[in-house]
Amino acid sequence: MNEFFDTIVVGGGQAGLSVSWHLKQIGREHIVLDRGRVGDTWRRRWDTFCLVTPNQYCQLPGFPYDGDEPKGFMLRDQIVDYLERYAKSFEPPYRGGVEVRRLGPSKNGGRFSLETSEGVLGAENVIVAAGTHQHPNVPAWGSKLAGDIVQLHSRDYRNPAQLPDGAVLVVGSGQSGCQIVEDLSAAGREMHLSVGSAGRIPRRYRGRDIIEWLEATGFYELPVDEHPAGRAIRFRAHPHLSGRDGGRTIDLRRLAVNGVRLHGRVIDANGCQLDLADDLVKNLDAIDEACSEGLVKIDGSIAENDIDAPENDLESVDWQPTKESATLDLMQAGINSVIYGTGFRFDFGWIDLPVFDDRGYPRYERGVTEVPGLYFVGLHWLHTWGSGLFYQVGRDAKHVVDLL
C-alpha cells in the first residue's frame, strides 16, 4: 500500500470541497481525490449555462457569495471561478487527475483500500462525494436513428454553432432540455420538444423569487422521508425554470405559443421516423396541476404566517395541442439534429462494498451507510432538497464529519 490516510474524500466538486473545509476546521488528516480539476463538472456545461437558484443561495462553508448580484444567476464561467476561489480560500489537500477505480475492504490495515490511477491508498474513513452524473442517459431508440442525424447529449452540447442548419428536436423537458430549447430558440432555430413529466415552477411569485418562497415556507427543511413522494423523489427531474437574462419562468404552453412544436414522449425510432406516446395533453395538464398545488401551499403559508405579499399576478397560458400525432417524420419536419436532455445514469460499480439496493443505488441515512467509516455527501435529496445544492450541501458535509 503506497499511502494511508485517516480520511479520503472521493470527488472534488462542491460536496467534496465542503467536506474538506469541515475536516480542516477540526484538524482531521485527509486527502481529496478528483479525477479532473476543480470545477470540471460545471466547466463542461454549455456556453450560456447559468444557475437557476439566485446567487445569494451559494453558501459553501466559510465562503458565502459576496458579489454584486445576490439576486442574479451566475453563468458557467462564474460558477467555475466561484469554486476555484473557494478552493484557494482554504487550500484543501486536493489531488486532481486521480481516478479511483475500486474501493473495497482493506487486507493490509485500516478499513478501506482504494485502487487509483496512481497506486493503492488506504483509509480508515471514505466519504464519497462523486455525484450521480457518471454516464449520459441516452434512449435505446437513438441507435435506430438515421446515420445522418446529429445526436448530442446535453453534456456535450455547447452552442448552436455545433449543429447543422435546420430544425432541432430536444428530447426531455427537464431543466437542461428546456434551457437548451431557450438557447437555440434565441439563435433563431426552429425547435421541437418531446415533453416528459418534469414539473415546473414560476420564476417569481407574489413579489419574490420562487426560491425565496421555498425557503420561507420550509421546503428546504423538509426531510426526504416527509416528502409526499418519499425517497422516490431522488430519481425525479428538477422542475424547469430559468436564470437566463435575469431569470424567467419556463412555461411549455408559452413556448408553444412562441413557436416551439411540442410532442409526446418518443417511444421508438426507425430511420427518420419517430413513434410518439399519446401523452402530451396528459403531461401538460399534470405539470400545470402540480405547479398549482405547490403555489396553493405557498399561499397557505403566507396566510398562516401573516406575510405581507402582493396578490397572485401570474398569467395563465391558454394553449392546447390541436392534434396529437402518433409519429414525427424528422425529414419532413426539417429536423437534422436531436439533443437528449434525458439526464444521467449513476454508476457506483467501482465500490465493492455491500451498501447498495437492487438498482445499484447506495443505502444510507443522511449519508451514513451500514458499513462503518463509509459515507456519501452531495446526492440529490440525500436528506433535503438542498443536499445536492450550493445552499445546503455544507450542512450534510458537517453532519458526516461530526460523526467521524
Annotated model-derived regions:
Residues P70-M74:
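Leloir-type glycosyltransferase catalytic cores
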Residues R37-P64, L255:
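Redox-cofactor-proximal catalytic regions of oxidoreductases
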Residues N2-G12, S18-D40, T48, L75-L404:
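Flavin (primarily FAD) cofactor-binding/catalytic cores of flavoenzymes
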